[in-house]
């Protein structure tokens, strides 16, 4: 059937707007290897402090070779167009196939659509992509672009002739994928005759329209699943019977996928997937595909799953919690080297454990990105329990260790990420411990003996510890990367041959957990983060720091994917690691006063952090951090209320409008444009001035289900969980999203100049939300002639937020430039709070 004979999805397409409906072919992928060679460079703590939009400057040899061969040259399509699926925009202007590739991989894809022109005429099309692309109109090639600068968008205008009636538009786009790849194109209809987009579909046009509306509006019936049945709600009945395939995946490093298939009848209004108790824990992506005949439509949703009922309350003693943590990981985590570590720590060798290790060895043998995450727990386990492994597996492990690439100065052709602090620690730890295991063998890439490799690794570990002890982490407060740092440090604390290194590593572990405790609200880290992802922001109970809090302080839950938990447990059980007892009380603040915690992180103290908490609320921000700059994965403000981990709010400027995407920044993780941020106690201000070309709104994560009471009215939003209360005030209307995945979860503030004022309090002082609103609804900020923002607060009086981040309030002066790496925690009286009476 030709395109002219089929039904069509027809959409108005205005001038100066993107063309967003397409048919796609299969994604072509081909491994791209170049000759092994060393690479210049060193650890770069500030790699994410981007200078040109979101461009990361480090270039691998494979990219250099690729550009030498293909930059400026016409891309070469690998096949003819054959439609296998239909792309629906869901508010994204791009056709976005971004993802994560662990080895250098050439990728390419065809896309096709039709522009139905009212009259013939000349038109201008603007093509944007990060890789290469060719544009065809009615079968005639109009030109190409091929900058191939990794993850940096380029644009090119094309003048084309449109005929009256349908005009076929084809785009072939390709690139070299290295780790996180921004693989997309955007085609804008800049100028020309009046047109509409017209995409052929093999079912009735009205049914195709209805299926798009259902995919656009579908959502989970809960914000998080803690044992309940998982249900996806449709906004309208299905117009036709269809097949539904769902792939449930974890984060981009997860090795597991769970597939479900359903047959849905016409008229269905929901999809019941079964109990979440039988599904894998963690934040999970549900990749949903509807198929009706040859029509294939899909989108991705995401939600947290946790199993608190099975896990129960944490044991009372540390010894029992250590045993519980090891047993939980051994029985319920992903089958990787971390799970194998926990099993070996419990004396569980044998076929199942060896199968886990064997399945992960290709990652190390082929130097996949993040192979260092896999290798370090394996080296720790091999050091302690190699006698539980078969001779054949030990030989294979030895071969993998000897052939691995431990640093960029060794020859290789991989795209392992050597630059961040957490990866650098793991590479150096692996070289140090791996060399010790095989002292007389030759490490192939460096040509060193194991003894020599150990010496080099030791020098680099010492240098890394020097840097950490002076500056700590540029990736401050990062929920995903604290466990990675702990993965390396626990291996050193247990296995380092040198006692000084063991002691320094142990002290560093304690320091990291002090930071977590100071920044935690009832055990859950709450505050600004240097690097964050949607899959580590949205969940609370199932992130690994929750499990670590359960291990150390008896409050938290387990997820499925872990990095450091069993290593930390073994360090406590077998290697004398101890934590100050007072950290438990700090992590779960219960007193009548408040804790104010100011500290700096990163080389030259570039990240100045402010945190304030009471037993009812916690709020953390970063002070005077690159206001107005393009952001990366920085979360600048984060708060929690009451005792429920899901009762959290953060505010950001989305880096992209596609939800559940791979952008850095993404829809929820990080900021496209960083705001000016100020905080004093439980009062904060965010001022956004958004760059052109970026999404024209800011938004707040505001999950109604997680709160006990809410009000959203005009420019005000109030929420209560337990005794904690939050008020958000916008400089425009705060619009609740009522359609799609973020229904009753997202508040949007339209405009490029968005101001949010955040004020927290508690039920004891305000009585209810009406009382909170009566006291604080008129809060506003005015700018004085020197650029300071001034707020008159009912409790704190005149609060002055100066442009350099200095705060003046209540006779105090807080200067972020003075905040030390070690930090200062002070206890402050809470205005209007009455001390709790002891039970009589």
Where on the chain are the PLM-derived regions?
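Extended amphipathic alpha-helical segments with heptad-repeat/coiled-coil character used for oligomerization
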Residues: 490, 499, 503-566
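Aromatic-lined ligand-binding clefts that engage carbohydrates, nucleic acids, or primary amines
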Residues: 117, 121-136, 169
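Ser/Thr/Asn(+Pro)-rich, low-complexity disordered segments
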Residues: 208-422, 456-460, 555-840
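Accessory carbohydrate-binding/adhesion or oligomerization-edge regions at the termini
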Residues: 1-90, 172-211
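Well-ordered alpha-helical scaffold segments within catalytic/enzyme domains
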Residues: 338-350, 374-391, 427-445, 486-498
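Beta-strand-rich ligand-recognition modules
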Residues: 134-186
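Short beta-strands within extracellular/lumenal beta-sheet-rich domains
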Residues: 103-115
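Active-site cradle of extracellular carbohydrate-active enzymes
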Residues: 418-466, 471
């Amino acid at each position: 059937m030709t395109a002219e004979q089929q039904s069509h999805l027809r959409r108005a397409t205005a001038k100066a707007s993107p063309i967003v409906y397409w048919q796609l072919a299969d994604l072509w992928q081909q491994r791209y290897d170049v000759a092994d060679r060393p690479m210049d460079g060193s650890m770069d703590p500030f790699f994410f402090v981007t200078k040109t939009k979101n461009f990361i400057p480090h270039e691998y040899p494979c990219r250099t070779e690729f550009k030498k061969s293909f930059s400026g040259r016409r891309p070469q399509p690998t096949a003819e167009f054959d439609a296998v699926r239909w792309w629906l925009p869901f508010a994204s202007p791009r056709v976005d196939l971004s993802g994560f590739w662990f080895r250098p991989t050439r990728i390419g894809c065809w896309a096709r659509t039709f522009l139905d022109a009212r009259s013939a005429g000349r038109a201008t099309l603007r093509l944007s992509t990060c890789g290469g692309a060719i544009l065809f109109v009615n079968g005639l090639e109009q030109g190409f672009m091929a900058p191939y600068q990794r993850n940096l968008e380029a644009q090119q205008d094309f003048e084309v002739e449109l005929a009256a009636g349908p005009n076929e538009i084809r785009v072939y786009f390709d690139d070299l994928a290295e780790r996180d790849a921004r693989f997309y194109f955007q085609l804008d209809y800049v100028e020309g005759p009046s047109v509409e987009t017209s995409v052929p579909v093999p079912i009735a046009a009205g049914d195709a329209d209805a299926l798009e509306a259902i995919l656009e509006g579908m959502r989970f019936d809960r914000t998080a699943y803690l044992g309940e049945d998982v249900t996806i709600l449709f906004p309208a009945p299905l117009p036709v019977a269809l097949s539904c395939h769902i792939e449930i995946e974890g984060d981009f490093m997860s090795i597991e996928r769970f597939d479900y298939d359903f047959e849905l009848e016409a008229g269905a209004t929901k999809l019941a997937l079964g109990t979440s108790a039988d599904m894998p824990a963690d934040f999970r992506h549900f990749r949903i595909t509807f198929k009706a005949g040859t029509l294939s439509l899909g989108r991705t949703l995401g939600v947290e799953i946790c199993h608190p009922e099975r896990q129960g309350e944490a044991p009372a003693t540390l010894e029992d919690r250590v045993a519980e943590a090891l047993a939980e990981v051994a029985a319920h985590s992903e089958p990787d080297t971390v799970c194998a570590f926990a099993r070996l720590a419990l004396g569980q060798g044998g076929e199942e454990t060896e199968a886990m290790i064997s399945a992960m060895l290709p990652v190390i043998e082929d130097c996949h990105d993040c192979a260092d995450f896999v290798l370090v727990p394996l080296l720790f386990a091999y050091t302690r329990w190699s006698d539980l492994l078969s001779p054949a597996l030990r030989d294979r492990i030895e071969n993998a260790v000897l052939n691995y690439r431990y640093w960029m100065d060794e020859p290789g052709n991989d795209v392992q990420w050597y630059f961040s602090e957490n990866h650098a620690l793991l590479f150096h730890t692996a070289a140090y411990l791996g060399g010790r295991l095989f002292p007389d063998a030759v490490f192939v890439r460096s040509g060193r003996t194991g003894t020599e490799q150990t010496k080099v690794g030791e020098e680099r570990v010492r240098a890394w510890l020097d840097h950490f002890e002076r500056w700590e982490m540029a990736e401050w407060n990062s929920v995903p990367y604290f466990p990675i740092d702990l993965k390396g440090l626990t291996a050193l604390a247990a296995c380092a041959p040198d006692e000084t290194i063991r002691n320094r590593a142990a002290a560093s572990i304690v320091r990291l957990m002090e930071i977590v405790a100071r920044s935690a609200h009832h055990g859950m880290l709450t505050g600004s983060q240097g690097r964050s992802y949607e899959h580590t922001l949205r969940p609370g109970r199932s992130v690994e720091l929750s499990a670590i809090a359960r291990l150390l302080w008896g409050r938290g839950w387990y997820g499925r994917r872990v990095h450091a938990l069993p290593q930390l447990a073994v360090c406590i059980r077998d290697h004398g690691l101890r934590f100050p007892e007072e950290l438990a009380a700090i992590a779960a603040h219960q007193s009548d006063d408040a804790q104010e915690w100011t500290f700096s992180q990163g080389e030259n103290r570039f990240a100045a952090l402010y945190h304030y908490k009471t037993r009812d609320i916690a709020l953390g921000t970063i002070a005077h951090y690159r206001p107005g700059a393009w952001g990366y994965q920085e979360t600048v403000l984060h708060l929690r209320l009451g005792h429920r981990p899901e009762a959290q709010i953060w505010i950001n400027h989305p880096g992209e409008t596609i939800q559940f995407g791979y952008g850095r920044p993404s829809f929820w993780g990080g900021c496209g444009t960083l705001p000016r941020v100020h905080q004093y106690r439980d009062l904060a201000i965010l001022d956004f001035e958004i760059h052109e070309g970026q999404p024209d709104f800011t938004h707040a994560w505001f999950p109604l289900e997680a709160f006990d009471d809410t009000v959203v009215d005009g420019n005000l939003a109030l929420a209560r969980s337990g005794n904690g209360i939050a008020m958000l005030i916008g400089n425009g209307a705060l619009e609740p999203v009522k359609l799609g995945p973020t229904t009753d979860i997202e508040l949007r503030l339209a405009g490029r100049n968005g101001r949010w004022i955040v004020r927290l309090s508690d039920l004891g002082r305000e009585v209810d939300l009406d009382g909170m609103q009566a006291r604080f609804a008129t809060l506003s900020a005015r700018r004085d002639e020197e650029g300071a923002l001034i707020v008159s607060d009912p409790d704190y009086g005149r609060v002055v937020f100066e442009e350099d981040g200095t705060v003046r309030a209540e006779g105090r002066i807080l200067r972020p430039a003075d905040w030390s790496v070690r930090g200062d925690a002070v206890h402050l009286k809470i205005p209007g709070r009455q001390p709790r009476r002891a039970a009589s």
